[in-house]
Regions:
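Aromatic-capped interface at the extracytoplasmic side
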Residues: 27-40
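Sec-exported extracytoplasmic/periplasmic mature domains
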Residues: 64, 68-76, 93-100, 104, ...
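N-terminal Lys/Arg-rich, disordered targeting/topogenic segments
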Residues: 1-9
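Short flanking/linker segments adjacent to small metal-binding domains or redox-active Cys/His motifs
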Residues: 183-202
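Mid-length scaffold segments of soluble, non-membrane domains
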Residues: 82-150
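Short extracytoplasmic
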Residues: 40, 44-79
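Soluble extracytoplasmic domains of inner/organellar membrane proteins
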Residues: 125-183
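Hydrophobic membrane-insertion alpha-helices, especially the h-region
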Residues: 13-29
Length: 202
């Protein structure tokens, strides 16, 4: 191969690499925007047990039930995530009291902030990895297996349906998380991007 042909060959590879890099960056920006949009419609609940001992895992579930019982009437007439966040912020002491009542003397910490979540499958929909507003309930040192769900809209209960997402989400976000026909590849892009960012921030 002549020098001229080699040079042309290298330029083609460089161009292909540049195009691929641009495609990845654009996909990443789109994926980050979609995850941020999805997260902006929700509030997650994260309960961490003292340890993995069966007794502590049972306590974790009792605390979960007490927190949900406390929150259900307070969020019943709430229709957007920002309002839900405001209600939760003003109810942190009540939530802590409810959790302590079920914790059997264990230390309880309750906070509302942002947390990174992995990709998580629920009944009929999947939430991609990324940052979400999160009500965090920690028992003791929180070294045990955790439990998480979506507290707004109220999807923590067994009878909850994915359709509860529709009033609080735009069409594109809802189509993504429910993986409607034709949206599977786009969801996978969002999922992979979120998992990549999660791993970089560990």
């Amino acid at each position: 191969m002549s020098f001229e042909n080699k040079s042309r060959h290298l330029h083609l590879w460089e161009l292909a690499g540049l195009i691929a890099l641009c495609a990845v960056m654009l996909s990443g920006l789109w994926a980050e925007g979609r995850q941020t949009s999805i997260a902006g419609s929700l509030v997650r609940l994260h309960v961490l047990a003292v340890s993995d001992a069966p007794e502590e895992q049972a306590v974790k579930l009792r605390v979960r039930d007490a927190v949900l019982e406390c929150l259900t009437p307070r969020l019943a007439d709430v229709h957007d995530a920002d309002k839900a966040g405001a209600v939760l912020t003003s109810s942190l002491d009540l939530i802590r009291t409810a959790a302590e009542g079920a914790a059997g003397g264990r230390a309880v910490r309750v906070s509302l902030g942002e947390e990174r979540y992995p990709t998580r499958d629920y009944a009929g929909f999947t939430l991609p990895a990324g940052r979400y507003r999160s009500l965090r309930v920690v028992l003791g040192e929180g070294q045990g297996h955790n439990w998480w769900c979506v507290v707004f809209p109220p999807l923590c209960l067994a009878a909850a349906e994915k359709e509860a997402m529709q009033p609080v989400m735009n069409f594109e976000d809802y189509a993504l998380i429910t993986r409607e026909e034709g949206w599977e590849i786009r969801f996978r892009i969002v999922e992979l991007w979120g998992e990549l960012i999660n791993s970089l921030e560990l």
